[in-house]
């Protein structure tokens, strides 16, 4: 009996070791992302002015096939800037408030770069941990589908159990590694500290193609039109989810932004190719080859960005522009390369 008990204990230990093995690293554990989509369904007329015009719709509550962290919309065609809002909830929980998402047709690759132009897509919304979603729109959107991303290893009950074990094991390894690690080498002079692509999990979102390079004359600052209540621990997951949405839903080569900043003032390296290089992003149609793009994680049309994040954006600009011989103040002339959403035709400055 003792031998049988010992054998069972050893077998259980072996299974447990195999389960946690992927997390036994001195880097933060990142589970494999899960992505899936579903067609929109159960629309009914939206009450109010849009309903009076026969245009607005609201969906029934939709149960996703798996738990998700991010949801976005994609459709075939429609108005340049439809009014769209989403709300989500976890199984057994309360609905979030309705949150507006935007198409932002002006955010995307330059023409003739090989990356597809912006089509009918709404900004991906960070939902935390959610199982249900509902949308409403001021107009019907043909071919509408919902795209979901889970980057936290919580898509199913079994994945949630495995991820909990792996995160626990990883936390122990990180604690030991932190106490033994030598002091980090000094950064490049003037370069702000930032989370590398490797550390926010870009290995799960590999670029489709090699980077292209242009010339940095100016900086475009955006917000990602996302939730503002993400935690410090969730922020790298938000960056990874945006990368996956840009790459796999929009069809771009990589994440569109060159840099991202969270509400805590942490800076993240964006598109691959080198933070100190003039990498062409996908943040301002017609001007990407002449600029760098910085995105604030959150929605800041009604909620102000935090002082820490504003200072982080300033640190990027005050380092990045002089690095490439561009002034940080005063007028700058950019020449448009065109694009369907660009008000200036190609060749106009």
Predicted regions located by residue number:
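Long, well-ordered alpha-helical scaffolding segments within enzyme catalytic domains
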Residues: 65-66, 81-82, 91, 231-250, ...
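Beta-sandwich interaction modules
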Residues: 26-67, 76-78, 82-149
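Short, conserved "active-site rim" segments that organize catalytic pockets and cofactor/ligand binding
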Residues: 74, 194, 198-276
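Extracellular structured ligand-interaction cores
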Residues: 68-70, 81-83, 130-132, 143, ...
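Extracellular/periplasmic catalytic domains that process cell-envelope and extracellular macromolecules
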Residues: 64-65, 126-128, 210-215, 250-253, ...
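Secretory targeting and sorting signals
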Residues: 1-25
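Exposed low-complexity, polar/acidic, P/S/T/G-rich flexible segments that act as propeptides
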Residues: 67-72, 129-134, 138-199, 204
């Amino acid at each position: 009996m003792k031998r049988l008990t010992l054998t069972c204990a050893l077998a259980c230990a072996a299974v447990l070791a195999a389960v946690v093995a992927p997390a036994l690293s001195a880097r933060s554990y990142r589970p494999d992302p899960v992505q899936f989509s579903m067609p929109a369904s159960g629309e009914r007329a939206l009450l109010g002015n849009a309903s009076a015009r026969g245009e607005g719709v609201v969906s029934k509550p939709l149960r996703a096939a798996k738990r998700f962290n991010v949801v976005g919309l994609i459709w075939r065609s429609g108005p340049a800037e439809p009014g769209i809002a989403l709300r989500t909830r976890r199984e057994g929980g309360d609905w979030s408030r309705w949150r507006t998402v935007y198409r932002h047709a002006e955010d995307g690759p330059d023409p003739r770069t090989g990356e597809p132009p912006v089509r009918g897509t709404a900004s991906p919304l960070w939902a935390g941990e959610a199982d249900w979603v509902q949308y409403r729109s001021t107009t019907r959107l043909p071919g509408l589908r919902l795209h979901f991303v889970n980057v936290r290893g919580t898509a199913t009950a079994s994945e949630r159990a495995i991820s909990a074990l792996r995160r626990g094991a990883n936390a122990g390894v990180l604690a030991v590694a932190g106490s033994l690690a030598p002091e980090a080498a000094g950064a490049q002079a003037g370069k702000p500290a930032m989370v590398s692509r490797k550390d926010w999990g870009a290995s799960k979102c590999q670029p489709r193609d090699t980077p292209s390079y242009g010339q940095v004359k100016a900086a475009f600052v955006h917000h990602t039109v996302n939730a503002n209540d993400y935690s410090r621990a969730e922020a790298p997951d938000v960056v990874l989810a945006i990368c996956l949405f840009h790459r796999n839903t929009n069809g771009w080569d990589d994440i569109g932004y060159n840099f991202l900043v969270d509400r805590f003032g942490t800076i993240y390296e964006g598109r691959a190719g080198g933070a100190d290089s003039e990498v062409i992003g996908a943040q301002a149609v017609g001007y990407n080859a002449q600029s760098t793009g910085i995105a604030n994680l959150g929605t800041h049309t009604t909620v102000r960005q935090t002082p820490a994040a504003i200072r982080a954006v300033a640190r990027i600009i005050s380092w990045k522009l002089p690095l490439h011989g561009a002034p940080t103040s005063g007028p700058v002339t950019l020449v448009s390369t065109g694009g369907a959403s660009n008000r200036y035709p190609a060749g106009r400055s």
